[in-house]
Amino acid sequence: MIGCRLEPPQGRTQSVHLSPAETKLTTLGKAAAQEQAKHPELSGLYLLSDPREAFAARGELAKRAEKALDVQYYIWHGDTTVSLLLETLYEAAERGVRVRMLIDDHGTSGLDEAFSAMDAHPNIEVRLFNPFVFRPFKLFGFVTEFDRANR
C-alpha cells in the first residue's frame, strides 16, 4: 500500500485503465454501447441520489465486472458498508478482475491492516490520496500538514 506520490512497489507492474476499445469487449461495455447508439444525444449519466440505491448499484457493477474496477472514495470508514464493499471487491479480484482503489487517507484510522491485506492480493492495488506519513498518529499529521492534507 502506497501513497499516490510514491513510486510503485518493486515487482509489480504499473497498471493503466482499460482503453475504450477494451471496455467495449465486456458484457457491460456492449450493453452501454447499445444504449448509447439508441440515444446519442444523451450523456449516459444517471444520478443516484438515494444512498441505498447507489450502494446497490456499485455492488451490482462490481459483481458483473469482467476486466477491471476502478473505485475512488473520499469518505471511507470501517463500517458495515465498507465491509460489504471490500468483500465484493475481493470476490471480483478472485475472479481475475483487476481492482484499483484510490482512497483519501483522511478518516481511514484503523484501516491500515485491511488496506494492506487487500493490497497484498495480486489483482488489487490500494492507493492513498493525501497519505499521512506518520501512520499511528494521523491527527498529528493532519495538524502539522494542514494545507497539504486539505487540498
Predicted segments, located by residue:
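HKD-type phospholipase D/PLD-like phosphodiesterase module
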Residues: 14-15, 22, 27, 34-68, ...
